[in-house]
Amino acid sequence: MRKYIYFIALICCALSASTSYAQKKVIKTMMIAGQDGSHYWRGACEAMKQILENSGMFKVDFVFTPDFGGDINTFKPDFAKYNLVVVNYGGEVWPEPVQKAFENYVADGGGVVIIHSSVVPMAGWKAYN
């Protein structure tokens, strides 16, 4: 009987250790959005953030572009801080330096998820497509 108790205790300890290790390994996620006149992007972003963070696997930060009419050249996200970039964006094409930084991020192994119509504004950007 003692052998079974020790065995169960050992399994509990192993599961506890693996669970706490998994919880510490959070995927830092940047969600890019803004300037989308055809979708309710704010609500979609909040919903996606809630789903991702409720899994316990992700920590999501929003990065928004300037509103329509604003200077898109002020948009300078720091991709290097993140393991994953989620693009939920339908506005102006990103400035050339941001495009290059994004391409380098992906080339260096950064993760990317493109949501729905986020390919539309980048139609002329070969590397993005």
Task: Set out the residue ranges of the language-model regions.
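Bacterial Sec-dependent N-terminal signal peptides
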Residues: 1-24
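Structural motif
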Residues: 84-88
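Short, acidic/glycine-rich phosphate-metal binding loop used to engage nucleotide
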Residues: 37, 91-92
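Aromatic-Pro/Gly-enriched surface loop or interdomain linker
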Residues: 22-81
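Residues that line or immediately flank small-molecule/substrate-binding pockets and catalytic motifs
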Residues: 8, 89, 119
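A glycine-rich, often tryptophan-bearing local segment used as a flexible ligand/cofactor-contacting loop or short
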Residues: 32, 92-129
